[in-house]
Amino acid sequence: MKKVIIYTDGACRGNGQENTIGAYGIVLMYGEHKKEIKKAFRDTTNNIMELSAVVEALSLLKEPCSIELYSDSAYVINAINQKWLDNWKKNNWKTASKSPVKNKELWEKLDELLKKHSVKFIKVKGHSDNEYNNRCDKLANEAMDEFNV
C-alpha cells in the first residue's frame, strides 16, 4: 500500500455571514512527488471548507493508500479521532444533543472514502511553524484572492 502524506486547510472570509468566499488548500506528497491544489467557493463556511479539503484530497487517490492526514481543524480531527462520525451514524445522523449533523453529505462522502484507505488523522497547530500547513493556508488565501478578481 502506497504511503501518502496529506496536509489540508480550509478558510472562509465572512464566515457566518451572507456572501462568503471560502477556499481550501491541499498538499499531497508521495515519495518525491508533491501536488498542490486550491479551490474557492461562494456562500460556504470554514468548516465546510476544512471538510471539503479532506474529501477532495482522499478522492484524488486512485488506489487504496496508507495516509497520514494533517489538519488544523478540530472539527475534522475530533469527528474522526473522538469517534463523533461513528456515533452520528449510529444515531441516524444526529448529534449527542439530538440535532441533525451539519454537512451530512460531506461526512457521508468522507465515510465512504475511509473504507477505501487507511488514514491516520493528525492535528497540527494552525498559523504556526508547520511548513505544509502554512502552505495550505497560503493556497486557500490565494484561491480566495483570485476568486475575488
Curated annotation (Swiss-Prot):
Pfam families the UniProt entry points to: RNase_H (PF00075)
A GO CC term attached to the entry: cytoplasm
Principal location listed in the UniProt entry: cytoplasm
GO biological process, one term: DNA replication, removal of RNA primer
Subunit structure: Monomer.
Role this protein plays: Endonuclease that specifically degrades the RNA of RNA-DNA hybrids.
Name of the protein: Ribonuclease H
Lineage of origin: Bacteria, Bacillati, Bacillota, Clostridia, Eubacteriales
Gene responsible for this protein: rnhA
